[in-house]
Amino acid sequence: PGFTTVFLSNILALMPASESSDLKSFYSAYLPLYKQSTSIFKEQKKQAQKIEQGFQYLKHYFPSYQLPNKLITFIGPINSFGSILTEDAIAIGLQLFMGKDHPLYTSEEGQALYPSYVSRKFEPSYIPVSAMNNIVLDIYPEQMSGKPLIAQIVELGKRMYVVDHLLPQ
């Protein structure tokens, strides 16, 4: 129930009045991608275990942080999020982790959205990294506006350092 509202309003950007027809359009357009994802992600234990390990480190390093209770996977539009934090869950958009050579990313539309240097990280092994990046961003919101480039680089380096310690392997 909680994620459904987030999915419909924030990911699909559906207005309540247009929900049913737009939802049907999305469903029919993305059903083939969903079917492909079920074969690619038959076995998600490895990614789920790494996220759980990251949660254990989070609990150790940030004991007051409220960890997500659930891990949810979904298929969203190609230009949607790779991971989303809700009040009680972390949701992973599998459409951005189908493998770097997936036709979705190598197509003209895919390359316009995500050039090769970006889509090379659209592998299942990057799911835990994306999840932990999102959590680190929740703990330390971006404050780079108006800062010099070197300060922004240092800020990003600090985030990478924290993520490296949450996912040590």
Predicted regions and their residues:
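N-terminal mature-domain "stem" immediately C-terminal to a signal peptide or N-terminal signal-anchor/transmembrane
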Residues: 1-32
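Acidic/His-rich structured neighborhood in mature extracellular/periplasmic domains
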Residues: 23-169
